[in-house]
Amino acid sequence: MPERTIADFKRLLADQPTASLLAAAQADPRKGVQQAYQHYLRQAEKQAVLVTRFNQHMRLERDFWAHGGQYVAGIDEVGRGPLAGPVVTAAVVLDDHFDLLEVNDSKQLTAKKRAALMPRILEEAVAVGIGVADAQQIDQLNIYEATRVAMAQAVRNLSVRPTRLLVDAMQVPVPIEQTRLIKGDAKSASISAASIVAKVVRDHLMTMYDQVYPGYDFADNMGYGTAKHLAGLASLGATPIHRQSFSPVRNAKRV
């Protein structure tokens, strides 16, 4: 058998290498082979970290399934703090076939990574529900209660009825048993997936609002009170999507 080329090693190491191939790569003195081997080791280490984290994040769901539960929904929200735009919630039901290792708290992911994961979550999840509370509801109810209403809406919009909810530090007003978790999006894959879905949906809405209401930099700040947003408020006044109960919106003129 002819000696493997450096290109051969690079190709084979990138595709589930056998133990014998790894041993051959480790023993090969050529610089190019050693570089390819070290790259494989770094990638394997990263993959192992992802697998470990994923298994930790699936622990609550797997425990629920092991005790006879069928559908557990993770719920999260995005947009409680901004001065403008809705609060968006998502409820996501997974099963034991779910294997997106990169799913994590949406705040730990780039916009590009969230956008890439979103369709895969929608494809692999058993069910996904969305809830939205607009600025008017937020002003009428307060942000906490509006978020709870939106979470209940997300649960109702699921195509299956969950028998357990995993919620990030809130109580959802639905007659379903709930487990409240502090920083749940870092502890549950279902909540992490919900945080990604809610974030992508809300960012898309705010990007659309940026076209409707130019001058506030919504596509960049997503409604949060950045310097450009506050400058827009001062010069243009508040829009219909601004939360009138939030300072400094309260004293701004209306568009």
Curated annotation (Swiss-Prot):
**Biological source species:** Lactiplantibacillus plantarum (strain ATCC BAA-793 / NCIMB 8826 / WCFS1) (Lactobacillus plantarum)
Function statement: Endonuclease that specifically degrades the RNA of RNA-DNA hybrids.
- Record flagged with keyword Zinc: no
Q: Which family does it belong to?
A: Belongs to the RNase HII family.
Name a GO molecular-function annotation. RNA-DNA hybrid ribonuclease activity
Q: Which metal ions or organic cofactors does this protein require, according to UniProt?
A: Mn(2+); Mg(2+)
Q: Which GO terms describe its cellular component?
A: cytoplasm; ribonuclease H2 complex
Q: Does the keyword Cytoplasm apply?
A: yes
- Under what name is this protein listed? Ribonuclease HII
Q: Where found in the cell?
A: Cytoplasm
Every copy of the RNase H type-2 domain together lies at 70-255
